[in-house]
Amino acid sequence: MKQEVHRIQEETLAELQQVSTLEALQELKVKVLGKKGSLTAQLRKMGGLSPEERPIFGQVVNETRDILEAAWIRREEELSQTAMLKQLEEEKLDISLPGVSLPQGHQHPLTKVIEEIEEIFLGMGFQIAEGPEIESDYYNFEALNLPKDHPAREMQDSFYITEEILLRTQTSPVQIRTMEKQRPQLPVKIICPGKVYRNDDDATHSPMFHQVEGLMVDRRIRMSDLKGILLSFSRMMFGESREIRLRPSFFPFTEPSAEVDVSCMLCGGAGCRICKGTGWIEILGSGMVHPRVLEMGGYDSKELTGFAFGMGVERIAMLKYGIEDMRLLFDNDLRFLQQF
């Protein structure tokens, strides 16, 4: 019987070397060590042995089982490694193949212009301030020298939510909020970019558009300071050869007030259809902060002065890129947007 066990061991070890797959290895294991396996069958013969022979024979069978199981583990590791290498070879990526190119995205022209405006004024020492788009009547009008019976309110057809709450018509409320928050610290030197809303819709107007307003409050601020800031901005935005002019105007929150024109980018001031033959194009409104607005912000108008300005980002973008219809900026036509 010992010879039979040794024969099973030798034959099994030989077959292990011939097995080439993990499936065949498992089948061989069941054939030898399974419940009906050849080595298991030898254990059933122990009943016919004498009590003295049984432990000796049992030890032989167990030693053989240990040898075969160790051999199985080694062979399984070898086959697993071989299978893995084969799989890696079959799934190997050819890095010489050209990659699939993806379409490149583009910044929206309004985003580009807003970021450029911010960068220019940050370089001049201004800080960015933001505020809510849903605003109170007080901050949007009254604190800006526009009481409820002021005729200038008719100039802005507003979107009211309640009698006292509306979508802001300008970013100027941020200036009042910043003055209240910052007082008595000086200087106040901010720009306020953001969305504003007015009930207007045509080729040059949109019910939602973007503004950037600026405010500087300190001692001895003069109109010449405002002009110098806006001249520097215009040249950095539209080119070093640009000039500006200030025309008298009216805004309730500034006194004196001025419209700011820049020399035409197309004709250089000679006159063309873009500037309507004048050589100048209006770009923003500005002026010295009205004393009442300073008082509403918590500052002494007898000790301090300031200037403010405001521009429509869409208008700046239209002038910078030669866009004739504002609605193109909101149509989401990729053929148009990919030009920028």
UniProtKB/Swiss-Prot annotation:
<dbReference type="InterPro" id="IPR004188">
    <property type="entry name" value="Phe-tRNA_ligase_II_N"/>
</dbReference>
<keyword id="KW-0547">Nucleotide-binding</keyword>
<keyword id="KW-0436">Ligase</keyword>
<dbReference type="InterPro" id="IPR045864">
    <property type="entry name" value="aa-tRNA-synth_II/BPL/LPL"/>
</dbReference>
<dbReference type="GO" id="GO:0016740">
    <property type="term" value="F:transferase activity"/>
</dbReference>
<comment type="similarity">
    <text>Belongs to the class-II aminoacyl-tRNA synthetase family. Phe-tRNA synthetase alpha subunit type 1 subfamily.</text>
</comment>
<dbReference type="GO" id="GO:0004826">
    <property type="term" value="F:phenylalanine-tRNA ligase activity"/>
</dbReference>
<dbReference type="InterPro" id="IPR022911">
    <property type="entry name" value="Phe_tRNA_ligase_alpha1_bac"/>
</dbReference>
<comment type="subunit">
    <text>Tetramer of two alpha and two beta subunits.</text>
</comment>
<keyword id="KW-0460">Magnesium</keyword>
<keyword id="KW-0648">Protein biosynthesis</keyword>
<dbReference type="InterPro" id="IPR002319">
    <property type="entry name" value="Phenylalanyl-tRNA_Synthase"/>
</dbReference>
<dbReference type="GO" id="GO:0000287">
    <property type="term" value="F:magnesium ion binding"/>
</dbReference>
<keyword id="KW-0030">Aminoacyl-tRNA synthetase</keyword>
<keyword id="KW-0963">Cytoplasm</keyword>
<dbReference type="InterPro" id="IPR010978">
    <property type="entry name" value="tRNA-bd_arm"/>
</dbReference>
<keyword id="KW-0479">Metal-binding</keyword>
<dbReference type="GO" id="GO:0005737">
    <property type="term" value="C:cytoplasm"/>
</dbReference>
<dbReference type="GO" id="GO:0140096">
    <property type="term" value="F:catalytic activity, acting on a protein"/>
</dbReference>
<dbReference type="Pfam" id="PF01409">
    <property type="entry name" value="tRNA-synt_2d"/>
</dbReference>
<protein>
    <recommendedName>
        <fullName>Phenylalanine--tRNA ligase alpha subunit</fullName>
        <ecNumber>6.1.1.20</ecNumber>
    </recommendedName>
</protein>
<dbReference type="InterPro" id="IPR004529">
    <property type="entry name" value="Phe-tRNA-synth_IIc_asu"/>
</dbReference>
<dbReference type="Pfam" id="PF02912">
    <property type="entry name" value="Phe_tRNA-synt_N"/>
</dbReference>
<feature type="binding site">
    <location>
        <position position="255"/>
    </location>
    <ligand>
        <name>Mg(2+)</name>
    </ligand>
</feature>
<keyword id="KW-0067">ATP-binding</keyword>
<dbReference type="GO" id="GO:0005524">
    <property type="term" value="F:ATP binding"/>
</dbReference>
<dbReference type="GO" id="GO:0000049">
    <property type="term" value="F:tRNA binding"/>
</dbReference>
<dbReference type="InterPro" id="IPR006195">
    <property type="entry name" value="aa-tRNA-synth_II"/>
</dbReference>
<dbReference type="GO" id="GO:0006432">
    <property type="term" value="P:phenylalanyl-tRNA aminoacylation"/>
</dbReference>
